[in-house]
Amino acid sequence: MKKVIIMSLALLVAGAASVRAADVKENWEKSCSKCHGPDGKGKTKMGEKLRVKDYTEAKVQEELKDDKMTKAIKDGVKDGDKTKMKGFGDALSDDEIKALVKFIRDFKK
C-alpha cells in the first residue's frame, strides 16, 4: 500500500510539473518567433539583422549544447555591451525553459 501511495504522489508531482506542448508553442510564438521565425530558420527582419542561427541545420544543432541554450534563454545574449537577446528567466520557469530547448531541438532536419 505504501508503494502505491508513493507512486501515485510521484506521478501527480510529475504531471503537475510538466509543460504542455501547446504552452511551449505559445511561448515560442510570443517570445522567440519574432527573431527566430515560426520555423526556427531565423529568416525574419530581426533575425537577419541579428544574424540568428538556423535551428533546422544539423550542424547548428550539433554545435549548440543544451546548457548553452538554457543559459541564453534564461539570461539573454550579449555581444559586447549590446543585448542581442533579452533573458526570459524572470518570465519562464525552469521547466518552461527546458521545454523550449526541446522544442528548438525538434526543428532539426
What residues fall within each predicted segment?
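Cleaved targeting-peptide boundary
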Residues: A21-E29
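Sec/Tat signal peptide C-region and signal peptidase I cleavage site
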Residues: G15-A21
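The canonical Cys-X-X-Cys-His
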Residues: W28-P38, L100, I104
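Short microdomains enriched in Cys/His and/or Lys/Arg
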Residues: V19, D54-L64
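Axial heme c-ligation environment in periplasmic c-type cytochrome domains
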Residues: K43-D54, A58, K71-F107
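Bacterial N-terminal signal peptides
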Residues: S8-G15
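Positively charged n-region of N-terminal signal peptides that target proteins for export
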Residues: M1-V4
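Soluble non-cytosolic domains of exported or imported proteins
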Residues: A22, E63, D67, A91-D95
